[in-house]
A protein has these predicted regions:
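General structural signal for secondary-structure boundaries
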Residues: 10-16, 36, 84, 98, ...
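Extreme N-terminal tail/first-helix region
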Residues: 1-23
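Acidic/His metal-coordination segments adjacent to aromatic residues that form catalytic metal sites
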Residues: 11-13, 51, 88-102, 133-141
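A structural signal for long alpha-helical coiled-coils and helix-turn connectors
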Residues: 36, 73, 118-121, 161
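Short, contiguous alpha-helical
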Residues: 2-7, 41-85, 111-114, 128-167
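Short gly/ser-rich anion-binding loops that grip negatively charged ligand groups
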Residues: 18, 55, 59, 103
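Acidic/histidine-rich alpha-helical segments that form the ligand environment
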Residues: 19-33, 89-126, 146
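Cytochrome P450 catalytic-domain "roof"
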Residues: 34-35, 40-41
Length: 167
């Protein structure tokens, strides 16, 4: 059974989904490149994330979901454990982190995921995993969920930017 092939021959849907993932780190970087440290740390309310923490969460999600994807490809219906995103953001102290390093890590994990998806045979997008909180889903459903999640957080970054800058 062939698991991988080049992007050539991919369905339009797969290519579009992969492209949406590929461009996210650049889009996030462009949104925040002109912001001051004070603006990057702006919190709209108590207990809410600042821009740096949202980007840190995206970095964490990219790392964890890359691992989940590899497990779904290499194992039969693996269990994919959840994680406490709030605790991880606090533990990694993204508010104090070097944003360039966080963005670079996000881009690196995303590049790895895009490479794997680019090479994955379309038929294998049906392979499944079992998330302990969400339940069973295919690689296609998993990646589509990832795209929606990242689009939501890109809008979150834009909203925080508007609040922090007044524009």
């Amino acid at each position: 059974m062939t698991l991988f092939q080049p992007l050539k021959g991919k369905s339009a849907e797969s290519v579009e989904t992969i492209e949406a993932l590929r461009v996210l780190p650049e889009q996030v970087g462009e949104e925040v490149e002109s912001l001051s440290e004070e603006q990057l740390r702006f919190r709209p309310g108590a207990g809410q994330w600042c821009i740096k923490e949202v980007i840190g969460h995206l970095r964490d999600f990219a790392e964890i979901d890359h691992d989940r994807l590899v497990r779904m490809i290499s194992m039969e219906s693996p269990l994919l454990p959840g994680y406490d995103q709030e605790a991880l953001v606090r533990a990694r102290n993204y508010q104090e982190a070097d944003l360039r390093a966080v963005l670079a890590a996000l881009a690196s994990f995303r590049e790895q995921t895009v490479h794997v998806l680019t090479e994955l045979v379309d038929a294998n997008w049906a392979r499944q995993g079992r998330h302990e909180e969400v339940g069973r889903f295919s690689i296609r459903q998993f990646v589509e969920r990832l795209v929606r999640h990242e689009a939501m957080h890109l809008e979150h970054v834009r909203a925080l930017k508007r609040q922090a800058t007044g524009f």
